[in-house]
């Protein structure tokens, strides 16, 4: 996603740079949430290898729901902040070079496959041998873990529904971009 941000800046367009600001916010919030939740998974299972997990949804439904929401936000699903950033950058790239836009979109599709695969390996299916003995003792998220998750997810949704909350303050600065490219 940071590569997409660089492409948005390189487009030297109001749409591309504005999209970059939105994507940087969305990426920061969604990745912070994913890191926090990944740490919760590792602390609960004692396992770093996602291919040795599985089935955690049954034991930790809140953790799974937040992880899925963070993954979908990171993928740029509509209603999350990342969506508007990615859409704006891709639109600016289309105006610049449809080929570069297509390559960037392909990268986003590959990223989506990896994100959904990680979720499926950790939370879906049956518990693997590495975590099966302690599976019934794995706790769900605590209140202290849910609170920051709710705050980050709410921020992602708020900006997803109201992207102008971030971009409205940038209009004067972004409008100067066309004069920089002459």
Question: Which positions does each model-derived feature cover?
Answer:
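Cytoplasmic/organellar membrane-interface segments at the starts of transmembrane helices
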Residues: 60-62, 116-182
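Functional transmembrane alpha-helices
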Residues: 1-138
């Amino acid at each position: 996603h940071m590569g997409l941000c660089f492409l948005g800046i390189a487009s030297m367009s109001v749409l591309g740079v504005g999209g970059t600001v939105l994507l940087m916010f969305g990426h920061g919030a969604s990745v912070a949430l994913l890191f926090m939740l990944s740490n919760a998974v590792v602390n609960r299972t004692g396992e770093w290898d996602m291919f040795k997990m599985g089935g955690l949804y049954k034991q930790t439904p809140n953790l799974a729901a937040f992880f899925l929401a963070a993954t979908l936000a990171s993928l740029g699903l509509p209603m999350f902040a990342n969506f508007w950033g990615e859409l704006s950058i891709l639109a600016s790239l289309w105006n610049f070079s449809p080929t570069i836009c297509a390559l960037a979109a392909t990268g986003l599709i590959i990223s989506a496959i990896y994100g959904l695969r990680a979720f499926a390996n950790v939370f879906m299916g049956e518990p693997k041998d590495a975590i099966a003995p302690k599976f019934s003792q794995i706790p769900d998220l605590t209140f202290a873990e849910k609170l920051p998750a709710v705050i980050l997810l709410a921020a992602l949704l708020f900006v997803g529904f109201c992207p102008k909350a971030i971009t409205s303050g940038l209009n004067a600065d972004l409008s100067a971009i066309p004069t920089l490219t002459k």
